[in-house]
Amino acid sequence: MSAPNQNTLWARTFVSELAASGVDTVCISPGSRSTPLTVAFDRHDSIETFSHLDERSAAYFALGRARRTGSVTPVVCTSGTAAANYHPAVIEASQARVPLLVLTADRPPELHDSGANQTVDQTKLYGDAVRWFHDIGEPEPTARKLRSLRTTAARSIMTATDTPAGPVHLNFPFRKPLEPTPVPGDIPDDLSEESITGRDGAFVESTTGNRVLDENSVNRIAQSLSTSRGLIVVGPMTIPGVDPEAVAAFAHASGFPVLADPLSGIRYGGLTRTTPIIGGYDGYLTSELWDQWPDPDVVLRFGASPTSKPLRQYLESTSPTQYLVDPAGEWREATFTATDIVVADPTQLLWQLSRALNTPGSSTWRQRWIEADKAHTDVLANTDSSAHQSLAATNSDSSTDDIIENTDEEGSNESDRWFCEGRILSDVMTAAPDPATIFVSNSMPVRDLDRFGSPTTQNRTVLGNRGASGIDGIISTALGAGSALATTEHLIAITGDLAYYHDMNGLAALERCDVTATIVLINNDGGGIFHKLPIESYDPPFTTQFVTPHGLDFEPTEDIYDLSFARVRGTDRDGFHTAFTEATTTTGSHVIEVVTDSESSHRVREQLHDRVIKRILDN
């Protein structure tokens, strides 16, 4: 591997070692100072490159690909504020445990604190949001330094994929010439072949294992779980997550129902055929109900904190014994009600506990949850569209209560029935092709999916940025996930209007990175989620400072980014079905804008919640 100068040798050596360690994709933000790295990645036969015009979008795209694959995705940029634009995605990767490798180019040391252009302090730029920061130092073509460089490459991959996974930041100072320009005498003639080419395979091979509890610890926990009323709660998890078969085995051995977050990897798929997967709890877990139910004795929890606030409040209020299982031993339970933390691999622990349990729990307890979830599903399925249609009508004199009361209890067979934004989420989950990767935005979409996205046997990989839960970078993250899909799997992104506005430039990746997507844009003209908060009662400033209606017309994105754009009203369910079916059965990328009213949707959510509670209590 001859090189024209030491910058080129340095970058080639590093990139070749990443490839030997399994890296097959990189996202590149164009820039001058990062030229050695960019050229090395671009010329490596085993690495696919994605070029991005915007640094923030590039980082989120890399995040999305790493989230979908579970493998490290590097992202490269030049010096200065380019690196700062990676910060939001780095924070998300850290909190969501996604393996990301950030490679920032830098100016030589003497240019720092000198007023030199495009020069900022990039040392530990991302603070404690990274698992490891290392300044590579200037290129030095010696055997020892090249071994160190290869070792650093291997270590960066090991650290990013360790437990917990997360981002790693490596900083590369380069002097000119940055291009692969021949520089006589730049590479010593006596440099050994191994120093230049490395070893066969990775320079440092990594072998890792899972944390497995000893038999006494397993038996102690199993004894506590040998009770009539228990729950399995699976919060958001990052791929590979927990093995569904292990969850099923423990659910059958214990008799416990499984409360599965939509981002858990458990709510959807074949597991639902044989295992009591509960998905509607966000729609009925209130004190009115749990005061009528016996409290759970014990809860076995996996993953991050559940999306559902009612579920978190239920666990806090009933105060059961709570085992928080985390392979990294980190605390991810913000109500501080967990009684035990178990540092173990979730899948291995479930298999161990399944073998150790002697008696299953109460079938009456399990059936209570199954029937409550069925009541929730039935109410949603049998609610007529007239509720939402009337609420959305201009200058309507009818109250929400009147409209709900006048709705036929058994519903309607009309295809054009609609009641709130949540129905969009449930219809997408039902009508999406099989298989599909579905990326859901923060704010209301993920909450509506939690409440309205009933468990299904269809193959759905549901992703979202629930680490730091920002609404920035949603489109870019979704398209990054889509870049990793086989041609037979569809990508569907569901986003609100503010998140869409935040990341419209991310749509450039559709063409630049050859990604195809169906994007469902729920446009309620502002921050509809604030209707769920007490500030709604204070107007002003509620409308101008929180809801922030914008009146933006998103249709021009059709021409800017060469995609198909359709607009339907939230009361036109048949129209949405037609547009969604066309989008998912024809070539190219599509945006389906569904125009809704956030306030009326919120009121209907409340009334549907009341109806579900009534149905459960009456039974």
Curated annotation (Swiss-Prot):
Its annotated pathway? Answer: Quinol/quinone metabolism; 1,4-dihydroxy-2-naphthoate biosynthesis; 1,4-dihydroxy-2-naphthoate from chorismate: step 2/7; Quinol/quinone metabolism; menaquinone biosynthesis
Q: Entry's CDD domains? A: TPP_PYR_MenD, TPP_SHCHC_synthase
Give the Enzyme Commission number. 2.2.1.9
The record's subunit annotation is: Homodimer.
Family in the record: Belongs to the TPP enzyme family. MenD subfamily.
Report the gene name.
Answer: menD
Query: What does the record note about the cofactor?
Result: Binds 1 thiamine pyrophosphate per subunit.
Identification of the protein by name:
2-succinyl-5-enolpyruvyl-6-hydroxy-3-cyclohexene-1-carboxylate synthase
Q: Which UniProt keywords apply?
A: Magnesium, Manganese, Menaquinone biosynthesis, Metal-binding, Thiamine pyrophosphate, Transferase
Which prosthetic group or cofactor does it need?
Mg(2+); Mn(2+); thiamine diphosphate
**Pfam families attached here?**
TPP_enzyme_C, TPP_enzyme_M_2, TPP_enzyme_N
For the keyword Cell membrane, the answer is no
Question: Could you name the domain of life of the organism this protein comes from?
Answer: Archaea
Q: Where is the composition biased (Polar residues)?
A: 385-398
